Amino acid sequence: DHIRVVMDLNPQVPDRNTRAGEAEAVLGAMAARLKVAGAQVLAMPCNTAHAQAAGIREAGLPFIDMVEATADAAVRGGARRIGVLATPGGERLYAAALDRRGAEAVLLTGADRAAFMALVYGVKRGEVGAEARAGMARLAQALAGAGGGAGAEALIAGCTEVPLLLDAEAAPLPLTDSAEVLAQACVEACRG
């Protein structure tokens, strides 16, 4: 069986990284329209947009929090130092969520953070070839404990663009895919 899905796919949502207030208003209006269309539970498949979840929650429907569900899944395996591949806004959300679970977020810094953002925006332009994949694998390795890395014991794909460049087989550590976690949580919530 498949669950019924009502979707508002809006590529005109303002950038969640640079125009957060505007994004929250648009996301809130989208959530209200989904409620009118018959939605009974809401989910937002953008990690960074969870910083604007208050606007979505104003619709008054249950909201599946992608960041919280992913943090739960990541610590379930026992890791306590978890590398987060996410935008700066997503990093803040994951650092707080992991801290609430007694785990530490290991984050990209400096040139690696800039390289990550370049890869994310590249995916949005359709750049998903071998060079982009190698770039994401290098960043994952930078977070890993081997080879002088940052010491992560597991990884979170905390941006939905990440799995388009790095899958679990190519990751140097166990990888929790936030999009997969959200999809599973949606199915579970709707099958109740």
Locations of the language-model features?
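Non-catalytic structural scaffold of enzyme domains
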Residues: 1-192
